[in-house]
């Protein structure tokens, strides 16, 4: 079915729901990736090393499981829609607070709180979208939904490339602070969610049947323990997947600027081209997973990332690096594009808003030192150059993603109602 026809087949309510969930994940990622582009500028502002500022990435990732469990539990109890509204407003507020942080310590606290808010968006939004959309095109919309993360990265890259070189303010109006102020604008999405989006029909059906009884958070944890094998498998899978994405994204702008001496504009544009590849990969592989299966598509995309390493990390011209970035992110996010559908199909209905998001963010926690390990390895063995560390990350993690996926279960086409 052609791209446009898939959207035409949706009802107005389904289109509004998908748009809201996609935008929520997009703007969440936009706020997160602004930090990765501004690491050097923030280090200069706080008179510290870039490695110290990279701790902000760690604390953001480390606190995401807290948000996933907190907001996921709220979504099971109060509904997906109102929880997502609170979630979007919360991460926007903490992004704005980061812009006005006067010290490194307060900045790290703001990023940790941002991580709590960020942690809830994926699980709640994916549950709301995939419970609302028709099962026949679930793989396609899964790929498109997941690539909201990539679109957010693309927006951050373009904003950095276009605006950052022209910002020359100081103090509370330093260049990176202005970008973080812009990052607070996603709060406006809350109004759209409030007026245009309907609650998940699956959640409403459960409530009307008496299944959505008021529950304490501890009750949700007891329910999750009842599905411990699948929960542990998803944590392992998401640890590999988050190492795959963050290992190829978080320090890549720094690598381009510090190691290859690319300008801020070139860095932003190379990252933007990579994100266009990621968007294409996520949508294509998500759709292909309907035909070839979730597992097979993930394994294929992950392993094809390995041959892309030479062009991606060992080129020297901006054009070659952009081509490498496009191909690398096509494969990385191609594998990721299958994940929302894959995890929601594997997750039992009573914990669908909690389990995928919570396991995903626990995977983020377990891989949250990834960029620290990459930088430490580079400092100790390669005089600070990230080239070898980034290359090794892709080869090792791509193989692990393929192996774990191949050994796990699949539930393509499962009923989510």
Pin down the residues of each PLM region.
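Extracytoplasmic gate region of multi-pass secondary transporters
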Residues: 36, 227-279, 367-371
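Conserved MFS/SLC helix-loop-helix module at the cytosolic interface between two early adjacent transmembrane helices
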Residues: 66-102, 292
């Amino acid at each position: 079915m052609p791209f446009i026809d898939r959207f035409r087949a949706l009802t107005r309510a389904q289109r509004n729901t998908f748009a809201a969930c996609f935008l929520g994940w997009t703007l969440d990622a936009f706020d997160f990736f602004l930090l990765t582009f501004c690491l050097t500028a923030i280090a200069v502002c706080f008179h510290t090393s870039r490695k110290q500022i990279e701790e902000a990435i760690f604390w953001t990732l480390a606190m995401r499981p807290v948000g996933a469990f907190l907001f996921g539990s709220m979504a099971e109890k109060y509904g997906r829609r109102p929880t997502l509204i609170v979630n979007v407003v919360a991460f926007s507020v903490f992004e704005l607070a980061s812009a006005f942080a006067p010290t490194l310590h307060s900045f790290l606290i703001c990023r940790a709180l941002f991580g709590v808010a960020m942690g809830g968006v994926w699980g709640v939004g994916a549950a709301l979208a995939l419970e609302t959309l028709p099962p026949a095109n679930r793989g396609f919309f899964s790929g498109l939904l997941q690539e909201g993360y990539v679109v957010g990265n693309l927006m951050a890259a373009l904003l950095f490339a276009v605006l950052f070189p022209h910002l020359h303010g100081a103090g509370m109006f330093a260049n990176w602070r202005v970008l973080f102020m812009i990052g607070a604008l996603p709060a406006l999405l809350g109004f759209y969610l409030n007026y245009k989006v309907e609650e998940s029909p699956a959640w409403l059906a459960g409530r009307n049947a008496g299944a959505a009884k008021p529950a304490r958070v501890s009750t949700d944890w007891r329910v999750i323990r009842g599905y411990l094998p699948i929960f542990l498998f998803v944590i392992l899978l998401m640890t590999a997947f988050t190492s795959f994405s963050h290992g190829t994204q978080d320090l890549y702008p720094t690598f381009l600027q510090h190691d290859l001496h690319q300008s801020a504009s070139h860095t932003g544009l190379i990252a933007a081209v990579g994100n266009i590849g990621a968007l294409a990969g996520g949508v294509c592989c998500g759709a292909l997973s309907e035909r070839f299966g979730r597992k097979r598509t993930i394994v294929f995309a992950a392993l094809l990332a390995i041959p892309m390493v030479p062009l991606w990390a060992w080129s020297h011209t901006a054009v070659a690096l952009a081509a490498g970035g496009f191909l690398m992110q096509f494969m990385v996010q191609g594998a990721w594009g299958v994940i929302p559908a894959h995890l929601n199909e594997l997750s039992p209905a009573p914990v669908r808003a909690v389990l995928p998001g919570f396991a995903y963010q626990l995977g983020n926690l377990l891989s949250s030192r990834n960029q620290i390990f990459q930088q430490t390895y580079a400092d100790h063995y390669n005089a600070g150059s990230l080239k070898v560390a980034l290359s090794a990350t892709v080869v090792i993690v791509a193989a692990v993603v393929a192996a774990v996926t191949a050994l796990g279960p699949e539930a393509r086409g499962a009923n989510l109602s």
